[in-house]
Design a protein with these regions (language model features):
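Condensing-enzyme catalytic core mediating Claisen C-C bond formation in acyl metabolism
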Residues: 5-9, 36, 216-293, 302, ...
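Acyl-CoA/ACP chain-elongation machinery
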Residues: 39, 184-230, 263-277, 307-315, ...
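Conserved small-residue
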Residues: 10, 28, 82, 103, ...
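Glycine-/small-residue-rich "gating" segment that lines the acyl/pantetheine channel
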Residues: 124-133, 174, 178, 194-251, ...
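Conserved beta-ketoacyl condensing-enzyme motif
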Residues: 8, 24, 32-164, 193-204, ...
Length: 420
């Protein structure tokens, strides 16, 4: 069976850097940080009091006020990003064969804010009995964002959610890619969303000592590949990529951002939260994606790394890149856009895939910000080009995106310039 080709024809994004793909990409290229003191709850007693929040978003510009109240914030963000993506791809909803269009979205946690609100209320007022909101369960469950997107547009194709912690939306893109190239759909609205900046989310990650506590300087807290890194910065947001079968896209005259050419998955099988210290799973997943794409290491010009700004994770990923890419590792660009967006958890893979697509389209690599001279980690090889502090213009023929999740889940996707 000859596999069909898959292209990216639309983008959507709501992130700490901007409420559209254009705003987000411009801020990435400029090296802006989305970190600031937390506004969504009183974090004054928490070890970490800052995060990368979505800012200045009026949800009711996109979603009817009454409907918005039925949605957890993560679902609101997912639906808005999907609306942007579908609009951007230029699909005629009146004539489209909606039976051949699906939705595959990734979510790492789901409606944790809704869960916190409902359970906290009951815990404070048990004498009132179990008076739960009838939308408690539908707002909370992790699969509901893809369901709302499908319902909103009337898409009857494959519809489900992938959940693999921080690899969730990369797994969603991989599944969407495979559904299309196997001929099971013409178009998939894919991506991911997360919004867990609440007491449970921040408190839980604080208890694990996973978050940066640089409360006096939030904008410089996320600093992947620097010796003074002290944990990741929590973020929220959503990203959407419209993946489409090439001939279907050409037939309707769609613009094409890039071609998706490969994906890979692997497991560390090592620890519930820590990366394998030698980067075993990272090595396996990049090798799998390259093989799937039919590309050699020297064909990749940019790697958007998982790069969360944790001690073990950054070192192990850099080791894996050197092992997989050999001499080519020193000729490509590496960057972590988490230095700007923070860690978007289940949405990370989608937003970082978008960064890869736009890097391929525009021949520019966004930076890894916040590195300072003299802040080198002796366990890292700075012969690698981490694209510190300033975007770099270069030809980007193909870009690879890594995402790794708690539980040892690893996923990788590759995009390249579209050519007939």
């Amino acid at each position: 069976m000859e596999l069909k080709r898959v292209v990216v024809t639309g983008l959507g994004a709501v992130t700490p850097l901007g409420n559209t793909p254009e705003e987000t990409w411009a801020a990435m290229v400029e090296g802006k940080s989305g970190a600031a003191p937390i506004t969504q709850f009183d974090a004054s007693l928490f070890k970490t009091q800052f995060a990368c929040e979505v800012k200045n978003l009026n949800v009711n510009d996109w979603i009817d006020r009454k409907e918005a109240r039925k949605l957890d914030r993560y679902t609101q963000l997912a639906l808005i990003a999907a609306m942007q993506g579908v609009k951007d791809c230029g699909l005629d909803l009146e004539t489209a064969n909606k039976n051949r269009i699906g939705v595959v979205f990734g979510v790492g946690i789901g409606g944790i804010k809704t869960f916190e609100e409902e359970v906290t209320y009951y815990g404070k007022h048990p004498e009132n009995g179990p008076k739960f909101n009838p939308f408690f369960i539908p707002k909370m469950i992790a699969d509901i964002a893809s369901g709302h997107i499908s319902i909103h547009f009337g898409f009857h194709g494959p519809n489900y959610t992938t959940t693999s912690a921080c690899a969730s939306s990369t797994n969603a893109l991989a599944d969407a890619f495979n559904l299309i190239r196997l001929g099971k759909a013409d178009m998939i609205v894919s991506g991911g969303a997360e919004s867990a900046i609440c007491a449970c989310g921040v408190g839980g990650f604080n208890a694990m000592k996973a978050l940066s506590t640089r409360n006096d300087d939030p904008e410089h807290a996320s600093r992947p590949f620097s010796a003074s890194r002290d944990g990741f910065v929590m973020g929220e947001g959503a990203g959407c990529l419209i993946l489409e079968e090439l001939e279907h896209a050409k037939a309707r005259g769609a613009k094409i951002y890039a071609e998706m050419v490969g994906e890979g998955e692997s497991a560390d099988a090592y620890h519930i939260t820590a990366s394998h210290p030698e980067g075993l799973g990272a090595k396996l997943v990049m090798e799998a994606a390259l093989e799937d794409a039919g590309l050699k290491p020297e064909d990749i010009d940019y790697i958007n790394v998982h790069g969360t700004s944790t001690h073990v994770g950054d070192i192990s990923e850099a080791k894996a890149i050197k092992e997989v890419f050999g001499d080519a590792a020193f000729k490509l660009n590496i960057s972590s856009t988490k230095s700007m967006t923070g860690h978007l958890l289940g949405a990370a893979g989608a937003v970082e895939a978008m960064a890869c697509v736009l890097s391929v389209k525009n021949d520019i690599v966004p930076p890894t910000i916040n590195h300072e001279e003299g802040d080198e980690d002796p366990e890292l090889d700075y012969s690698l080009n981490f694209t510190f502090n300033k975007a770099q213009k270069r030809e980007v023929r193909a870009a690879l995106s890594n995402t790794f999740g708690f539980g040892g889940h690893n996923a990788c996707v590759i995009f390249k310039k579209y050519a007939e």
